């Protein structure tokens, strides 16, 4: 619920308060890659419809996420890792300055998870992730622990190291 809460999801119930910086624009990456609105459309079609990107600029942004070779493929035919990278790209194009990733490597094979991690490494904003993937956390610099009492603590290392 934490990620949905800070993404602005009004259906999440919580007590207390939080405030994001004035220039923080959160973008939520759901645990599932279910996007019925993407079905039947190629990556180029989606980039044109949502961001008016013509062929050259569209291929350029797809190349940054190592999915330019899939430009003409339908979203549904992409691997899990390719779908994840495309979704991160869309969040970036939407102006998100803080990515909220809910189990981003869940159901990805190792190669797909590595590709996603590589793409996130090039992202210039803040990345907040909820994950149970020990491998994925190795590049993180800060860890938050959610206690049973509802309090949030910062830790110098991931909790599964304790």
Label each PLM-derived region with a short phrase.
Residues 1-162:
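ABC ATP-binding cassette signature C-motif
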């Amino acid at each position: 619920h934490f990620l949905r809460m800070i993404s602005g999801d009004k259906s999440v119930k919580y007590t207390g308060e939080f405030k994001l910086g004035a220039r923080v624009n959160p973008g939520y990456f759901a645990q599932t890659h279910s996007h019925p609105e993407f079905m039947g459309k190629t990556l180029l079609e989606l980039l044109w419809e949502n961001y008016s990107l013509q062929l050259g600029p569209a291929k350029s942004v797809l190349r940054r996420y190592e999915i330019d070779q899939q430009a003409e493929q339908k979203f549904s035919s992409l691997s899990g890792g390719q779908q994840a990278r495309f979704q991160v790209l869309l969040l970036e194009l939407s102006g998100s300055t803080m990515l909220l990733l809910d189990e981003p490597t869940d159901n990805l094979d190792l190669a797909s998870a590595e590709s996603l991690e590589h793409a996130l490494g090039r992202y210039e904003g803040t990345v907040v992730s909820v994950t149970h993937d020990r491998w994925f956390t190795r590049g993180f610099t800060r860890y938050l622990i959610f206690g049973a009492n509802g309090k949030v603590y910062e830790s110098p290392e991931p909790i599964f190291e304790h």
